[in-house]
Amino acid sequence: MGPAGAKTNPAWAGIVAGSLLLVVSCWFAAAPKSVKASSEADEAAAARLAYSEKTAAKYNFRYGKEFPFLPSNATTDNGQFINPKSFYTADYCGHCHKESHDQWRQSAHSNSNRVPYYLKNVELLNVEKGIEFSRHCEGCHDPIAVVSGALTQGAPKKRPYDQDGVTCSVCHSIQQGDTRGTGSYVMGVPAVMVDEEGKPISRPVSDGEILAHLDRHSKAVMRDFYRTSEFCSSCHKAALPKALNDFKWQRAISLYDEWQASSFAKQSPLPFYVKDSVSTCQTCHMQREALKTSDYGAKKNQLASHRWLGANTVIPKIYGFDEQAARVVEFLKNSVFNIDIFALEHGDTEDSAKWQDVAAPLGLVSFKTAAGDVLTADVVIQNKGIAHSHVPEQRDMYESWVEFAVKDANGRVLTQSGAIEGGGELDARAHSFTNRLINVKGELNNLHQVWNNRVVAYNNTIQAGRSQLVRYAFQIPAGTTGSVSITATVKYRRFNQHFMDFGMGKHYEMPIVDMASQTRVVNIGENKPVTPGPLENKEWMRWNNYGIALLDAQQYAASVHAFERVAQMRSDYADAFTNIAIAQFQWEKYGDAHGNLEKALALAPTSARTLYYRALVERNEGHLDLAIGDLETVVKSFPRSRDAHRELGFSYYQQHKYELARTEYETLQSIDPDDLAAHYNLSILYRRLGAKDKAAQQAAMFADQKDDPMASTYALEYLRQHTELANESVVWHVHELNVPAITQAAAPVSAGGLH
């Protein structure tokens, strides 16, 4: 295949092809007519048992011999340990899969267990609680160490396979998995070929054998579920179990759940927008790309990318992976967000009962400003390109925020929010997509000590397909002439500076990526409509996103008004009326909601989204039969809608149809094993149906997984001491910049206040 790093050319390819033909031909001549598969399998099983028993003799079975891998959910095919030498190295796979190997080497998977910041964080856990607790992390960061029994007292701290992290033979040896996450996979002994009977061959296999039986190689290393999001959920979903924190179960990462409920999955009727086709994790993170070197896994000269492009900009910098760095930045900038500086609210807000004068949508209406004016900019940020939340996962150490700046005509900054301050720290009052994890002492877990979590004091993110409204109040200084520019930018860097400096053992500067940005110029004096830019949404969608953002900010009256503007512009758009009804339903105006749902159904009689919300209204009105009929229709159209199954199960329960209710909640658990409502209701249903053992099991799971009602006291005390975060934790707040202290408005708009 040529010297390492060499690009394939026709002459070299011919030499390679001839050499391979010779190798394969010689192997065929030397190969025995039959293989003693049974004896090989017996020998392999005996060797594995011997290794497992030897390992078990010195292993810390903290959670009992029946749960050797806790606090990870990982397990092996027969419960025995697997010799780490059974795992083929990535270099071995690279013989034939050069390009996949080269891409993998630069990926987060490859470096999952060797980057300094991860090792420092795990060492905190090892010192504080013991190495056996680190199985919780290593089940996904270093699976070979977990299933080989290496994470116990007295075992070597440095292992050769650590440098490969999640290597080829890890993912391609997983036999099955489920959506509990935290390493919820079943690992088998790696094999790169199966025999004539389809049984794995665990002995070393030559390249020639593989090339002679590519079909048997494929059967050994590929499974259909590797192409599903459920496969990824084994690690890209996680919880903090009692076995780790000595407290109770807490959700940590819910990427799979977020995807499954989004429009990208097309498994739920509830998203605000509809995608044309299904996108899985692999669709975005393993896009097919043109082959550059050589790889026998390529099809039609294209290869499923093994870079797993995401958001880690630090690994490429640490190891000098320039191509990966450029590709990650490109990925982060690829139409993930739409930023819309949607409105300007004129006047101060000292009188909270006063409806403000609002110019919206900016660029399409005329308005006036003057030097000395106090303005509040309404910035709408739409998550249109991510199939999960931004920022995803635990969020405590990741850092993404909104930078907002007002400049005069000469480019001088008049006021701003979200600047990087001395030492690399972010402005503490910036609007950030992050959270705050609080421990039992009411203190911040600022080094990702998730094993000490008790409560999340603050949690801000934008889910897939949703929008968020960020408001900034500022004053145009007296004497300003010409114009001012207003710029809003979503920025991203991998970690906050405090965690990164800890992780690297020194101050370490990280790349900062501008994911999306918009600038609007406001004239001092008259402002007239302008031609929309190429990246701007259509007017109806701008109003729609504004309405979604207001809805999530619990500003129901304003949200209804925004959605009504959509209905005026698109009278044939059924979801406009459904959206009005959703806001009215949350506002507890059930009669009004019902009327708008009927308008929507007149336009789209089979809309599962509208039928779902009509069912909720009907049930609230006491019409259970009608509600059940609508929900049954929804479930037929969306059999994996967790919301529909949950509500249908409760409706059956209200009618004492316990068997039907049980079926719905069991179906719900097949989609989400940790659904809290399913645990609670099944604990009641099983008891009423005489299944007392199952009832007790579900009751115990509910008790473990429900939030601790007293934990909020830690959060309240922390917020009391951190006023900058207390303000951020209020869903409807204003970032007050260069203006005197003001009282926030009761609402942003009124029917008569908009231009």
Q: Language-model features: where?
A:
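Primarily the internal scaffold of c-type cytochrome electron-transfer domains
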Residues: K36-P84, S100-F133, G149-A464, R471-T480, ...
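Helix-start (N-cap) detector for alpha-helical repeat units in TPR-like alpha-solenoids
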Residues: W540, A574-D575, A608-R609, R642-D643, ...
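Structural signature of tandem alpha-helical TPR/SEL1-like repeats
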Residues: A553-R565, D572, Q586-K599, T606-R609, ...
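Structural marker of alpha-solenoid helical repeat scaffolds
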Residues: M569, L603, S637-F638, S670-I671, ...
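TPR/TPR-like (Sel1-like) alpha-helical repeat modules
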Residues: E666, S670, L676, Y680-A711
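Alpha-helical linker/edge segments of TPR/alpha-solenoid repeat scaffolds
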Residues: G690-Q698, D707-T713, Q721-V739
